[in-house]
Amino acid sequence: MMTRKQDQEIDHAFLEMRVRDAWEYRKKTVDTSSCRVIFGEADFLPGLVIDKFSDVLVVESLALGIDRMKEEIVDILKAVLSEDGITIRGVYERSDAKVRQNEGMERVKGFIGEEFDTKVEIVENGVRYMVDVKDGQKTGFFLDQKYNRLAIQRLCKDAEVLDCFTHTGSFALNAGIAGAKHVTGVDASELGIEQARENARLNGLEDRVEFVCADVFDLLPKLEEE
């Protein structure tokens, strides 16, 4: 649902209103250096997700109706951000979820506009990450886990920590930066582990935070035996 008004025209002015409302809300509630700027139904733009990672936008479109408007919405968002002095250097589309096929759409992955370096560094909760918006999972990083990652910091000082399904190491790194004695992160994805190790180096944590590429369900019984 985009509006509750039956006579509301879905035009450029309407889309600009929705985008401005979404951005103004983020400015009041979250750290906007990296955040989910557009969150589908929550912003009355159903089926559309736009994540901002520093100066990069990542777009995920999951419904046919909004798919036809996505590039116009992206252009509006870039213009709105520029009013706050924010220049977007690139936009990448990650509309590669299977659910698109339910509405007869192909799975799409690629640049919207000019090509650019798809790796971007962000900082969250005092932890530095290199996000790969092209090859990472989903839109590149799980922004929705920000406060769960922060909560980990309060629990991990002087602890030994095992982070299963670590992806790019975000929970492991939050444990490490909070003073954990030793942290092991495990994931079956070689790419994810490679990125996690790079993130550990970015934060100077490679001596206390290690990453293992393995199937968690195979590894846990072995660890239990040790």
Map each language-model feature to its residues.
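A short, charged
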Residues: D21-T29, S82-E103, R154-A178, A188
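Non-catalytic accessory regions of SAM-dependent methyltransferases
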Residues: M1-S54, L202
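Rossmann-like S-adenosyl-L-methionine
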Residues: G110-E226
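Short amphipathic alpha-helical segments
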Residues: D11-L15, G65, M69-I73
